[in-house]
Amino acid sequence: MAVDVRTQIEVGRPRDEVAAFAADPDNAPRWYANIKSVTWKSPRPLAVGSQIEFAAEFLGRRLVYTYEVKELVPGERFVMATAEGPFPMRTTYTWADAARGGTTMELRNEGQPSGFKSIAAPFVKLAMKRENRKDLRRLKELLESS
């Protein structure tokens, strides 16, 4: 069973500011509760083809995986994907102008778990949606308080 989770939030900051912060992998541990560290596997700056290793904890397990940037349109869209492990994942961020100079950000995670993980896909989907909501709220708090 495929997992496809979309979560949105409106942030009271300009789109270019929200996108620049969210698309910078070095900021991920600041707003993703489960991401503990980020290691660049390719030289900066961020570009299509860049590889970034994330160490995370999700559902009580430590996960280390390398994402590759697949698409980068500053201020509009950022796509990265990993083919590693039992749960290959594609993560997409999109940003659009919202009312009063704010930004609507959508976080989408798509994956196709294999083996035992495929049986747990409905549970994983619910947990992922819950965590994504928390993460986007944290991103909003960080950006609106600065």
Task: Locate predicted features.
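Hydrophobic ligand-binding cavity/cleft-lining segments
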Residues: 1-47, 144
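Short, surface-exposed coil-to-beta transition loops
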Residues: 4-6, 62-66, 88-92
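Generic structural detector for well-ordered beta-strands
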Residues: 8-12, 39, 55, 68, ...
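Beta-strand elements of well-folded, non-transmembrane domains
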Residues: 11, 58-60, 111-115
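A short, structured loop/turn motif at beta-sheet edges
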Residues: 15-16, 43-46, 70-75, 94-104, ...
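Short beta-strand segments that buttress and anchor functional surface loops
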Residues: 51-57, 78-84
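Short, charged/polar surface micro-motifs in flexible loops or helix N-caps
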Residues: 59-62, 71-77, 86
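Beta-strand/loop substructures that line and gate deep hydrophobic ligand-binding cavities in soluble
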Residues: 79-134, 139
